[in-house]
Amino acid sequence: MGRLKLHSGIKAIEEEPEDFECTDSSNTTTLACMIDTEIAAVLAVMRRNVRWGGRYMSGDDQLEHSLIQSLKALRKQVFSWNQPWHTISPMLYLQPFLDVIRSDETGAPITSIALSSVYKILNLNVIDQNTANIEDAMHLVVDSVTSCRFEVTDPASEEVVLMKILQVLLACMKNKASVMLSNQHVCTVVNTCFRVVHQAGMKGELLQRVARHTMHELVRCIFSHLPDVERTETTLVNRAGSIKQEKAGVDSDYAIVSKPVEDGNANSEYDVENSMATFATGAQSLMDDGPVGPGSRKPASPYDLHIMTEPYGVPSMVEIFHFLCSLLNVVEHVGMGSRSNTIAFDEDVPLFALNLINSAIELGGSSIRHHPRLLSLIQDELFRNLMQFGLSMSPLILSMVCSIVLNLYQHLRTELKLQLEAFFSCVILRLAQGKYGPSYQQQEVAMEALVNFCRQKSFMVEMYANLDCDITCSNVFEELSNLLSKSTFPVNCPLSAMHILALDGLIAVIQGMAERISNGLTGLDLGPVHLDEYTPFWMVKCDNYSDPNHWVSFVRRRKYIKRRLMIGADHFNRDPKKGLEFLQGTHLLPDKLDPQSVACFFRYTAGLDKNLVGDFLGNHDEFCVQVLNEFAGTFDFQYMNLDTALRLFLETFRLPGESQKIQRVLEAFSERYYMQSPEILANKDAALVLSYSIIMLNTDQHNVQVKKKMTEEDFIRNNRHINGGNDLPREFLSELFHSICNNEIRTTPEQGAGFPEMTPSRWIDLMHKSKKTAPYILADSRAYLDHDMFAIMSGPTIAAISVVFDHAEHEDVYQTCIDGFLAIAKISACHHLEDVLDDLVVSLCKFTTLLNPSSVDEPVLAFGDDAKARMATITIFTIANKYGDYIRTGWRNILDCILRLHKLGLLPARVASDAADESEHSSEQGQGKPLANSLSSAHLQSMGTPRRSSGLMGRFSQLLSLDTEEPRSQPTEQQLAAHQRTLQTIQKCHIDSIFTESKFLQAESLLQLARALIWAAGRPQKGTSSPEDEDTAVFCLELLIAITLNNRDRIVLLWQGVYEHIATIAQSTVMPCNLVDKAIFGLLRICQRLLPYKESLADELLRSLQLVLKLDARVADAYCEQIAIEVSRLVKANANHIRSQAGWRTITSLLSITARHPEASESGFDAVSFVMSEGTHLYPANYVLCVDAARQFAESRVGQSERSIRALDLMGDSLEFLAKWALSAKENMGEEDFGKMSQDIGEMWLRLVQGLRKVCLDQREDVRNHALQSLQKCLGGVDGINLAHSMWSQCFDKVIFTVLDDLLEIAAGSQKDYRNMEGTLLLAIKLLSKVFLQQLQELSQLSTFCKLWLGVLTRMEKYMKVKVRGKKSDKLQESVPELLKNILLVMKTKGVLLQRSALGGDSLWELTWLHVNNIAPSMRLELFPDQESSQLGDDETVSNGLSSPENTTGS
């Protein structure tokens, strides 16, 4: 039952005893010699004394003194012992020495040497629990030493004896056989030591220190065994009766009581037995009499005596610990708010006691929780004293109190939830803020203690989970984190150690959160909490407080409710009715109010206006009365004095002033109190009357306006016969009277200002609550609640660390701040708190202000010399690279830093590179070419000029070089070092990674980065802008294009913004410049690179190139050649990916523009040739567009006739693809689709021949003639194309007849501009003849054949009459009749031209000969001799009727 296990050994604390193996005779002999030596030493000292030495010199035959006889007898025996030493009873060889010690005839020197002998024997390690008769021997040693008597001859020898006594008692406790000591003996040892400690205050310094050290070692030795002690819950709980705690302390059934020390003169006899503390059973507590005052014994029960005589264990430890706690009670004047400065006593005794208590807790550790009485002492009496001494003026005491609480937190926090809350609220927060009068030293100690707690990884999490998320507890985490943040701020003062200390605490909390992130995801759904309906929540418990799957969601919900309740309390304080309505609307009160829920709201919600609560509870309304009764029912008044219960009740609201309201309130209180504590009071009426009487006494005693105060007798007399007609016990009423007189009941409690004072009634309430409070939640190493916690503290924390960083001057402080910033960034990113990360970036960017070129003369050197700016810069870009996914508006500030570095020329040469397909942009590209890695330079250079001093090494070389105008001195070593530091800083930033790795950014972050680049570039203005602004805009545009190209898979996300930005630049620029250069060619690069990957966006990408078509003429002309090259590249690389007509229209438009540009036309034509020559990239969608583009090149005089002829060949050769498409359509399509396709192909063919028709009018003879040949080829090679009959009619009207007419007109009027028109006309008339004959069969089917035939004849007739250079053409005169004759023969052969033709009757026949006669009169006779004579008369008729043009046209 709570005893030490015999097998556990003593944990030595101080000296290692000599080790002897007593298994052989030689060792037995050795030990015998040692004991003989000690006997000799004692006898020698005794002989020196006159009293003892004279007996040997006497001649009388007197017997020797019994002390000497026993020593000599031992001397005779000791060498005769041959058995193993452990079988010899220690009493045999200890008794003679102990007799000397106990004798009152021996002086101090003799007693001292005897004590030394016992000490040596105990330290020989020859005695253990297995030694014979060891129990009696150990008891004898303790009894003898604690009963030591000796004559005091001088103070020094007295102190030596006392020190020897301490040595022997400590050796007893450290000996392996100490387990055989009883609880009573252990208490006696401790009491004896304490008496020496107490007396040492009046003696030498050395004795004081030795006594205290021994006391300390004793406590350590005793409590080091607690982990080895069997659990004692059952044994101790089953003891008689229950432990009452009404006096806020554990009243032991046995206690150490001390007797006073009587001071004697130098020759007086010293009696340790009478001067030491003696053991007494009973309930007389040292709390009342003090550890050094007289104590009265009371008879001990047989059970108590039984416990105390058993081998020592928990009972003695409980007694000792209770004794140590009681030492704190004798100095209550050191209490809260005390300003006494009697440090000598105020510090000495409490410090001594606190040190001993701390040692006991350190060694007992978590084992204490298994022993209810020890735990109860700590929960109540110890913690109450700690709360008191925590507000001591002494920093030493405060420091020790904080150390004890930290140890208790480590070992017993699950049992001390509310005690810890009270300590932080009433002590740490109060002192650390420094607002309520503590000294700077107190404030510093409190802050150090808080920081120590923050360094415990789970401390803040557990405070948040157990207290902040408990509706009935204060927000300790929130208050502590706010305190740390505020204490970090230097307000109108330089940075001090206190600020750095608070910073350390803040960083410790943040880094704890960051470390938990590394421990893996929680796997829990931690989304926002909502309340959809009211459910009673005040007394709800979690299903399992040890399983995160249960408690995490539970406490988050409780915190949400608590936060909403705070808002509700604020509404209630402004208007109680609207406040309750608000709570109903947020489902914190039921839709129909019930008394219990409103009562709980009043009872457990912090921050309520207590005046309003009191008025509500005192109201006569029936509902309010019900609420009052329910409110009283929430209190636990069991085992509580009436005045304590009343104090507790009235602290929760302000007692109304009206008597009726007071009556109602006290009635509710009295009924509840009587229900729970009916021991003394006869009925609830007695409780009511007495409560009224207490209120009246309180007013009488503490109202300054009352001159004549009520006496104790008056109070007792006033309360006669109130207890059911009988009197209450006088002692009971007297106790009430003095309690009220000494401690006022505050009926007007303070409204939440400042920190609560831990009054006795509040402490009793806390102890009652602690029995019912929710279990303490132990947090593991995962980030269950960090999101919610960090959201609370992030803002103040960033501000606090930033202020310290701003004010700091030492690099170690800088590094601490940087560690904090990086931890904040990590947490923000992990929990997706984008706003927090943005705030952090904004704060950090402020510290790079030295990068601003205007702030200093040599910004690069200044940057290199400024450690703070360099560290901040590295941190910003570390955050951007690591946590860029969660940066939003912060990109603007980051870009601001990048632009500052860019303006100084400090950026590495590849920041703006798109890091993809670099081979695409080689150094061979000429002037005006957009280079992917053309990087920011400090100053704009003219186009094509090599950039000097762009980038960091350029700046460095500038520093090293000699200026041509003003020679510079060589840079100093400091300047070189500063430049080297700058170089290293920029390298560590990895700025280029932000953009090259942008493909890994989350979509929203990427979009914000792009927007930030557009914003940073600024809006281009029409007209001239400063070179610096343009350089910035160019740099931003390069970066924007780089991230666009790096994010081709997400181009849809970026495209709108990128396009609009480039469009703004293109449309606002009226002169060639670097910015529009980057914009145009950046756009072309984007299209080139993205078309293969985003066919769905191809039309939009290509449509964007229309911006190039809209460029100002001067700009377009300057870049036309390069545009052509880029478009040509685009076409060659992506022709397969351009499918739509709209896309090709843009491309061909761009190519067509180049046709007339001297430098650009070659590239443009190259692209057109690429598309049309092989035909692999020619589609129905782009056919007409490509033909038109080729026509532009054919008509262009740039590139000589050869290129025009090549263009005509492209047009002519394209006919075969029409035939292929027609054949493919016929084979693969249905009838309907084929018909539509044939129609489309016919339209394409018509557009082809119309295009060729236009080129047939070219001034250049070879081009013109080649065009006619190509036209003839295209008109004649239509066999594979299914042209509709009507198409030929259009063809003759719009193409063939038109080109013949136009050429005829040119021949007639523009002879000077057109050379050798005769050959062209000849080709044209041959074209007409050939096409007509080839298509005669088709044409003859037309209803308009007559009209078409008339057109042919008319043109032939005109060409016969045409004059070239003033005379008729011989070639035409010769060719036209021949061609006509050929036509007529074919028509005759095919039956088209007959005298009575079915197609046109006589009119076609007559019409034909009318015109033929004008060309060749003899042809009719030659071709139709048989019909000549019969038709002579008819010719005249026809001639008369159809000779006019109107009639001719009408036919």
UniProtKB/Swiss-Prot annotation:
Pfam families registered for this protein in UniProt: Sec7 (PF01369), Sec7-like_HUS (PF12783), TPR_28 (PF23325)
Superkingdom field: Eukaryota
PROSITE patterns: SEC7 (PS50190)
UniProt KW keywords: Cell adhesion, Cell membrane, Cytoplasm, Endocytosis, Endosome, ER-Golgi transport, Guanine-nucleotide releasing factor, Membrane, Protein transport, Transport
Membrane-topology annotation of the record: Peripheral membrane protein
Active-site feature positions: E658
Mutant lacking the gene: phenotype: Lack of morphological features of apical-basal polarity resulting of no root, no true hypocotyl and abnormal shoot apical meristem. Cell wall alterations. Defects in cell adhesion. Aberrant leaf venation.
Outcome when changing G951E: Defects in hydrotropic response
Keyword Cell membrane annotated: yes
Region (DCB domain): 1-246
An example molecular function term from Gene Ontology annotations: identical protein binding
Tissues of expression: Stems, leaves, flowers, siliques, floral inflorescence and roots. Expressed in the whole plant (at the protein level).
Domain SEC7: 557-752
GO biological process: basipetal auxin transport; cell adhesion; cell wall organization; cellular response to cold; cytokinesis by cell plate formation; embryo development ending in seed dormancy; embryonic pattern specification; endocytosis
Cell compartment(s), UniProt: Cytoplasm, Cytosol; Endosome membrane; Cell membrane
Major location (coarse): cytoplasm
Chain segments carrying region Disordered: 1430-1451
SUPFAM superfamilies, alphabetized: ARM repeat, Sec7 domain
Record remark on domains: The DCB domain is required for both homodimerization and interaction with CYP protein. Heterotypic interaction of DCB domain with the N-terminal part of the SEC7 domain is required for membrane association and catalytic activity of the protein.
Function: Activates the ARF proteins by exchanging bound GDP for free GTP. Plays a role in vesicular protein sorting. Acts as the major regulator of endosomal vesicle trafficking but is also involved in the endocytosis process. Could function redundantly with GNL1 in the retrograde Golgi to endoplasmic reticulum trafficking. Regulates vesicle trafficking required for the coordinated polar localization of auxin efflux carriers which in turn determines the direction of auxin flow.
Name this polypeptide is given: ARF guanine-nucleotide exchange factor GNOM
Species of origin: Arabidopsis thaliana
Species lineage: Eukaryota, Viridiplantae, Streptophyta, Embryophyta, Tracheophyta
